[in-house]
């Protein structure tokens, strides 16, 4: 029997030393699943609410005992006897129990941990892998692909304590024949970059997502360092490796002055000027993807950006869309961006996450599955990427176990699926 008999919540630690929520879901047949909710640093204002205790005497107010309490009491009671194979029903029970638009009563962290743990328990009950169960839930049974990784090898912005304003500088191993080879190429470039930075007298300390966090003179200097590292590793930029940016522009947007302020290099831009600044970078370097190139509320600016670059460059909405179908639909209807970043804790349940993926794909948008800067050893996003054939994944650099755990899971999945899960490289990127 795949009915839920026990739900357990607990407070565990994330990769930044902050508490987060973990849940176990047990079924009548002995099957069970465990999942943990991640946590972001640069968060969109429209994200579902991450419930924190606010008790300054404990974990600086970041405890999650309230959310854990909801799991162990209200949620556990409501889900007792529910069929774990009916994911949408399980999730809807929790959404109804919460009763708010942004999950502010129970917390998206509580609901998500239970939602994902339920999916894992159901997969075990069916005696299938998690990615296989996710493909079934997605309405695409047996359809898989290995994602093109977007590897964040230089961290800036809110993910690092340095002078670089753009948050992520990523490499994409488009020349690889399979995921295993892509991972190797990324690792070799990561180590090559360490040597380049050291030779120039820069720190090789890493940021939240495992990439280096040097103090560089400009954002362009980060791209220049990566260019040298790629060549030194024996690869050709533009042929073997392409580049991607996550600007996280909301973090350096001055709302009062209505300007984009790159403090690290002392430059200020209007919305239109910043679009041209980004376009100029794409003409100097093989940048094929730009995420959150403007503030999340700058819809006019995004419309201009999409007209300017949308036919050639993948323009990814993260803070812009926050994995929310209502907001995504507005973007689709108004010609804003052409790709969505998927972070399931932005919306708070697996069912709603799958709905966002479907809406994006149906509209011709590409999909990038993503981690958060505060992560755990939970590798569910690897299975999500393969099980939905999303095509792309962002899960950090080639260091820190919380990042590498996802890559290692993808290696295992590729070993299991072989030719059933093709690695399509650059074909997955919008505009390429």
Swiss-Prot record:
EC annotation from Swiss-Prot or TrEMBL: 4.2.1.11
Residues annotated as binding (2R)-2-phosphoglycerate: 167, 343, 372-373, 394
Keyword Cytoplasm: yes
CDD domains the record matches: enolase
Pathway: Carbohydrate degradation; glycolysis; pyruvate from D-glyceraldehyde 3-phosphate: step 4/5
Entry cofactors: Mg(2+)
Chief place where the protein resides: cytoplasm
Entry keywords, A to Z: Cytoplasm, Glycolysis, Lyase, Magnesium, Metal-binding, Secreted
Catalytic reaction annotation: (2R)-2-phosphoglycerate = phosphoenolpyruvate + H2O
GO molecular function, one term: phosphopyruvate hydratase activity
Binding site for Mg(2+): 246, 291, 318
Cofactor: binding details: Binds a second Mg(2+) ion via substrate during catalysis.
Active site, renumbered: 209, 343
Single Gene Ontology BP annotation: glycolytic process
GO cellular component: cell surface; extracellular region; phosphopyruvate hydratase complex
Subcellular location: Cytoplasm; Secreted; Cell surface
Assembly and interaction partners: Component of the RNA degradosome, a multiprotein complex involved in RNA processing and mRNA degradation.
Family statement drawn from the similarity comment of this UniProt entry: Belongs to the enolase family.
Job description of the protein: Catalyzes the reversible conversion of 2-phosphoglycerate (2-PG) into phosphoenolpyruvate (PEP). It is essential for the degradation of carbohydrates via glycolysis.
Alphabetized HAMAP family for the sequence: Enolase
Stored NCBIfam families: eno
Designated name of the protein: Enolase
Gene that specifies this protein: eno
């Amino acid at each position: 029997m795949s009915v839920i008999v026990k739900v357990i919540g607990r407070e565990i630690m994330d990769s930044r030393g902050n508490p987060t929520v973990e849940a176990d879901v047990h079924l009548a047949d002995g099957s069970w699943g465990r999942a943990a909710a991640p946590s972001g640093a640069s968060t969109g204002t429209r994200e579902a609410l991450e419930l924190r205790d606010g008790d300054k005497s404990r974990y600086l107010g970041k405890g999650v005992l309230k959310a854990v309490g909801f799991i162990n009491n209200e949620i556990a009671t409501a889900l007792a006897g529910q069929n774990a194979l009916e994911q949408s029903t399980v999730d809807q029970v929790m959404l109804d129990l919460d009763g708010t638009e942004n999950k502010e009563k129970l917390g998206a962290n509580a609901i998500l941990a239970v939602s994902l743990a339920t999916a894992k328990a159901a997969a075990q009950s069916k005696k299938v892998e998690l990615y296989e169960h996710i493909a079934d839930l997605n309405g695409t049974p047996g359809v898989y692909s290995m994602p093109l990784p977007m590897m964040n090898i230089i961290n800036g912005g809110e993910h690092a304590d340095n002078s670089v304003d753009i948050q992520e500088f990523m490499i994409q191993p488009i020349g690889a024949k399979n995921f295993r080879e892509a991972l190797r190429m990324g690792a070799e470039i990561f180590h090559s970059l360490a040597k380049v930075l050291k030779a120039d007298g820069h720190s090789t300390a890493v940021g939240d997502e495992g990439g280096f966090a040097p103090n560089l003179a400009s954002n362009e200097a980060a791209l220049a360092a990566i260019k040298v590292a790629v060549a030194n590793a024996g690869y050709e930029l533009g042929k073997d490796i392409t580049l991607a940016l996550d600007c996280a522009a909301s973090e350096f947007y001055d709302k009062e002055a209505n300007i984009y302020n790159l403090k690290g290099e002392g430059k200020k831009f209007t919305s239109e000027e910043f679009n041209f600044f980004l376009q100029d970078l794409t003409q100097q370097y093989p940048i094929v993807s730009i995420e959150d190139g403007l503030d999340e509320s700058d819809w006019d600016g995004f419309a201009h950006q999409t007209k300017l670059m949308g036919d050639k460059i993948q323009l990814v909405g993260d803070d812009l869309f926050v994995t929310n179908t209502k907001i995504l639909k507005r973007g689709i209807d108004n010609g804003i961006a052409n790709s969505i970043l998927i972070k399931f804790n932005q919306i708070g349940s697996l069912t709603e996450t799958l709905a966002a993926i479907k809406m994006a794909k149906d509209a011709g948008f590409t999909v990038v599955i993503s981690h958060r800067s505060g992560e755990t050893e939970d590798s569910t996003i690897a299975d999500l990427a393969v099980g939905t054939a999303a095509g792309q994944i962002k899960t950090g650099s080639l260091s820190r176990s919380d990042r590498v755990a996802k890559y290692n899971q993808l290696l295992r999945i590729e070993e299991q699926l072989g030719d059933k899960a093709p690695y399509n490289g650059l074909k997955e990127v919008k505009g390429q």
